[in-house]
Amino acid sequence: SADYDGILLSTTGDKSDAIITRDLSKTLTVMPGDCLVIALIDEKAGIKGILHAGWKGLIDGVIVNTINMFKEKGANVNNIRGLLFPSVSMNCYDLGEDVISRFRDFAKELGLNEKEVISYNKEKEKYNIDLRKLALTQIKKLGIKDENMSVMEYCTYSSKDEKGNLKFHSHRRDRTLSMNMALFLGKE
C-alpha cells in the first residue's frame, strides 16, 4: 500500500485497484469498463474506499487487501457497509479456457460449488463467470454482514432503459475505451 496525502492506495502486485481515505469529505473516483466497482464505508471509524475488482484483481486479492487496510486503519467489519455498482452480468461475461482453472480454484477456496459461479456457453464456446457472487461471498467470508451490502443489479453490457436504449458504456460490448463510466464516492 502507499499513502498520498491521506489517500491510501491498496496495491495488488504492481497495480493499484483501490483507494481508501480517512477524510470523508474527499471524493474518490474510479473508471471501470465492465468490472465490479465496490464502495465501502465505516462511518464510525471515518474510513471510506472504492475498489475496482476485475477478474484478475478479484482472484489476486483486491477485496481482501482493501478490507484488511480498512481494519488496519481502525474499521470494524461489523460497521462496514458497501455497494456493488453496475457491472457485466454472468450471462454477458465470457472467458476462455485459459483462465477458467483459476476461477475453479478460487470458487473452491471460497467454499462455492463451481456450478454456482461458472457456466459454459456451448454456442459461444466460452465460460461465463458470476463476479458479483464471487465478490459477495468473499466479502461475507471476511466478516461483512449480508445486510450491510447492497447490489445494483444492472448489467453494463445489456441493461436498457425504458426506451430500449443501452444504459451504460461497455468496454466488452463496444470494444473502446471512450465513453467510459466514472463512478464517484463523495460526501452526502
Regions found by a protein language model. Name each.
Residues 1-188:
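Active-site microenvironment for binding and transforming phosphate-containing groups
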